[in-house]
């Protein structure tokens, strides 16, 4: 795993050095960590916007400090307080929500507050990470940790009016597991998410 994370960081650094915008499409949310590390090296005033069903703020998960359940906590370790903006959150341990109260800007259940966050960030460099389990499992069951009560596709499309105003310097879409949705509907939705993001951030 360490080799894979190092490779992701190196490739992200190369893309950024060419003054291009990294856009990763991946399965495990942990791969966001090295990409944010590389982006932070170039943009020390970086902010992170996270769309996700889960806080991902555990100190450790199954005795591992590097995991999809700890990725945002590891990012906070070097990014610091007030730099992480979480939306759609509807699952997490009590300790994670307490940590968020003190160290991140957490918005439960939906994307309410996004417009205000975008207005506050203005031209600040932003890394956008979208965990696809932010969507309701009724429309996106193909993910490892689905959570009821998520957003729907048109809510996401509407959010892009705000997202398009941001200075997004890198981004990713993650946590699609096609094997968990043999209908192909989740894969189709993931493809539409990627397409709409490309159109929004041009």
Which positions does each model-derived feature cover?
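Conserved alpha-helical scaffold segments that buttress catalytic/binding sites
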Residues: 1-202
């Amino acid at each position: 795993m360490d080799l894979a994370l190092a490779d992701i960081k190196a490739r992200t650094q190369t893309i950024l050095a060419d003054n291009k915008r990294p856009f990763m499409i991946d399965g495990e949310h942990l791969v966001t960590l090295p990409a944010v590390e590389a982006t932070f090296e170039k943009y020390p005033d970086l902010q992170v916007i996270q769309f996700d069903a889960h806080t991902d703020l555990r100190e450790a998960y199954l005795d591992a400090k590097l995991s999809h359940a700890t990725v945002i906590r590891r990012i906070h370790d070097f990014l610091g307080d007030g730099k992480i903006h979480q939306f759609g959150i509807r699952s997490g341990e009590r300790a994670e929500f307490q940590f968020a109260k003190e160290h991140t800007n957490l918005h439960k259940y939906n994307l309410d507050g996004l417009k205000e966050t975008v207005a506050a960030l203005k031209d600040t460099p932003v890394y956008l990470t979208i965990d696809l389990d932010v969507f309701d499992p009724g429309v996106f069951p193909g993910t490892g940790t689905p959570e009821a009560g998520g957003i729907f596709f048109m809510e996401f499309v509407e959010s892009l009016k705000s997202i398009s105003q941001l200075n997004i310097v890198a981004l990713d879409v993650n946590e699609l597991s096609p094997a968990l949705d043999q209908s192909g509907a989740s894969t189709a939705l993931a493809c539409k998410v990627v397409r709409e993001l490309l159109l929004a951030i041009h």
